[in-house]
Amino acid sequence: DDILYNWAKEMSAYVKSIDPHHMVSVGDEGFYNLGYQEAARQDLPSSAYSGYYGVDFDKLMTIDTVDFGTPHMYVDQWGFDLGDDDLEWIKRHAQTTSSADKPIIFEEFGLTDKTKRDAAYSDWLDIVTGDYYEGVEYQGFNYWMIASYLDDGTLYQDYDGYTVYGPE
């Protein structure tokens, strides 16, 4: 079904009709629509690649009024294997946007397992900054949640387990 695609096409065209110089993205998670059989054949997590959520990142990047890609990644929620599915996800999205001749920003990402987070974030940011795969580079990234100390000296509460804390 093309509900999300048609909506993104209509809304991005509307924004461009008001301000043709405004940069537009969809802000979606970046799920693919390869179908269940193809996702299984490629040994990819079916929920993120099968089309289950009605999102088709490849197709969204063909919209000429969408200027850049903004995938997200939450490995614990999506059942990704660290060191495999996560790296493929980041690489594949850069390849998709490169093929569409569009920039890409790793818009949101998180990992709640703090014993694995530093190493995983290091790997992910190596890819995002172009230090991992030849020809794969993002134009920027955002942590889902970055926080610091409050005025009273306590840390901002970690509501969902994804918060990264800055220095004091």
Residue ranges of model-derived segments:
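Extracellular glycoside hydrolase catalytic/binding regions
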Residues: 1-137
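Aromatic/acidic polysaccharide-binding cleft in carbohydrate-active enzymes
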Residues: 110, 130-168
